[in-house]
Amino acid sequence: MAFTDRVEFTKEMKKEGYTILAPNMAPIHFRLFENLFASYGYNVEILQTRGRQIVDEGLKYVHNDTCYPALLTIGQMMDALHSGKYDLHKTALIITQTGGGCRASNYIHLLRKALEKDGLSYIPVISLNMSGLEKNSGFKLTLPMIRKALGVLAYGDLLMLLHNQTRPYEKEAGASRKLVDDWTKKLTDMFAKEKGYSAKEMETILPQIAEDFANVPVTGEKKVRVGVVGEIYVKYSPIGNNDLEEFLFSQNCETMVPGLLGFMPVSYTHLRAHETAAISYA
């Protein structure tokens, strides 16, 4: 198969229950996204793998002059394919593609090149984008799905923020983590019943989440607050930043990581710029 060919993710593949592997980035958010996709019939699995082998796999297929996030995301997916855990003839991959100036828009092509090099070019790679860059008959982002995804981002941002604010001060170790897990389950159950996404519902649920975290017994001491900024993948991904949040926690610090919702206007700006300039992705 020529590298220029693209294997489409078809409706038949969705019906057959293909496993769709996705690299991890923001653990709290992506657990919610995994459940959102499941509610639409997509068997998405967010990869939880860690270890040096991911870097080694990435170095096999991605030039070391390419950015580290590309090496890690592609390495994590190739490592999963080589694990023997999946039926490679019923497996697909998914990766985001913003369409902006960042080289992240080209990760998908680097991934397909890696698959071709490894003799796995028959595995479909889905582009997760809102810019019309690529389309697949078996995977579609609908307006209701996008609206729900924005809700997931809001919930994920709040859970991440409150967990980071509470964990360094909690009297009972693990109390804030338990709240994250409990609310993830509650939200998942709501999503399955088509609830929890409307503005009216969120106006009720978001304060409930905040109240639960506010009720966690804390020590009240003052600690150094450390903000984490930078490239989006490295900022959120534990394997991208060498578990920076855990390291800061071990150093008696409170971590502040900005929410993912703040990235959405950037993606929207890319889309509007292309529309205004009448540039086609075709």
PLM region descriptions:
Residues 1-275, 280:
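An N-terminal assembly and electron-transfer interface module characteristic of large anaerobic redox
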